[in-house]
Regions:
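Conserved catalytic-core segment of nucleotide-activated headgroup transferases in glycan assembly
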Residues: 1-108, 167
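Acidic donor-binding loop of glycosyltransferase active sites
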Residues: 108-125
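Catalytic binding pocket for nucleotide-activated donors in carbohydrate/polymer assembly enzymes
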Residues: 120-184
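A structural signal for short secondary-structure junctions
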Residues: 19-20, 111-112, 134, 157
Length: 184
């Protein structure tokens, strides 16, 4: 996740004119949540409902310990927290099983609405998430350290819809730049 968030920070820090359109990135990783944000639920029902300024605006569910959450820690104090930034992040720390209280749709229903997915795995023996994206006609970015990425690189001369970024122990900054460039 670090290289994905770093790529979003790189996009947000770059010239806004470089982006072809605004970017809304969802980080959908279950974490220690204690239920959906009440203010967000109210806003989804009524666009005039007030948002709670004491809650981090980039999150869909309350966290049991937001001060210890690595994703919040990573985006805090960056342009990703700026509501005027052309790059926005929404952290969804809940299983998307159709009853999360915010989306109330399962993962696959939400996946179909994505323009692209990013799974910059450092290591996954196979890594089904990029495969699921392609199965739902959503282009994906993965790495040469994920089994699926390796398989695509080895078996598909033209792998349209799947970008495989070369990743190793020493090239995180290059991976960040390549992901940012691909999203751009």
């Amino acid at each position: 996740l670090d290289v994905f968030v770093d790529s979003l920070i790189q996009l947000a820090d770059g010239p806004a004119a470089a982006l072809k359109r605004p970017v809304l990135a969802y980080i959908t990783v279950p974490a220690g949540n204690v239920g959906p944000r009440k203010d967000l639920q109210a806003r989804l029902k009524d666009p005039n409902a007030q948002m709670d300024p004491s809650v981090i605006r980039n999150i869909t569910h309350y966290l049991s310990a937001p001060e210890w959450d690595p994703i919040i820690g990573k985006i805090k104090n960056t342009k990703l927290m700026d509501p005027t930034s052309p790059v926005q992040v929404m952290f969804v720390p809940s299983y998307l099983n159709g009853v999360d209280g915010i989306f109330d749709k399962d993962y696959y229903e939400l996946l179909c609405g994505m323009d692209v997915t990013v799974f910059p795995s450092y290591y996954e023996p196979w890594g089904y998430t990029p495969l699921e994206s392609v199965a739902f006609s959503v282009p994906t970015i993965t790495t040469s350290l994920a089994g699926f990425g390796l398989w695509v690189a080895e078996h598909c001369k033209e792998h349209k819809g799947v970008e495989v970024i070369d990743r190793n122990d020493a090239n995180d900054s290059e991976v960040v730049t390549e992901i940012a460039s691909s999203i751009e």
